Amino acid sequence: LDENGRGKRPVVNQKRGEPREFGRLLQDIVGVEAIVNRVVVHEPFDAQMKWIEETNRDYEIENLIIVGGESSNVKYPGPSVNEVLHSISREYNENGGDIFCGGIAIPSRTAESKNLIKKSENGSEFFTTQVLYDSSNIIKMIGHYQERCDELNTFPRRLLLSFAPVSSQKNIEFLKWLGVEIPSET
């Protein structure tokens, strides 16, 4: 599925290397644990789990961020983020697997704290945000998330905040196309 709902892509989509191969090289050469993102909604559940098991076993990647689709209004052919998180944490890891799972947090999304709780219940141990250029939504989301955790008597999962420099107007246009909120004064 492509991203036609957003209009014309402002930057040409480049052919990319296999992220798990890059992750393995990063681990081998630099000596740090890699975290690999995996979009799970575009292929069937069994194909996703096979990829995840191979990534853990053959590439020695132990940290994954499980990513969904661009919109909750689209019916994707693959499993949901929560289905995959649940399968990894409750089945794969309990049978000898060793994957530390995370998820994506999008601070501008309404009621994102509920999504974080649900992902945590299904096995997400940490979250990383979409790239941030405005602090208001992340401050609000963290506050709501802490309140929900307190109400449920559970602990908040680690939240990694993502930042990136912008060097051109073309970068800004692409980030906006991706759905990143950038204040007009930026």
Segments predicted by a language model, with ranges:
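Glycine-rich, proline-tolerant flexible connector loops at the mouths of alpha/beta enzymes
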Residues: 1-19, 69-76, 129-145
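Active-site-proximal loop/turn and secondary-structure-junction residues that shape catalytic pockets
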Residues: 2-5, 40-43, 68-72, 105-109, ...
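Flavin-dependent oxidoreductase catalytic cores
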Residues: 9-39, 45
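Active-site mouth loops of central-metabolism enzymes
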Residues: 33-47, 98-112, 186
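Conserved, mostly hydrophobic/aromatic
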Residues: 55-56, 119, 123, 161
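A structural motif
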Residues: 60-61, 124
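Active-site pocket-lining/capping segments in soluble small-molecule metabolic enzymes
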Residues: 64-106, 149-186
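Active-site glycine-rich loop that binds ribose-phosphate moieties when present
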Residues: 83-90, 108-122
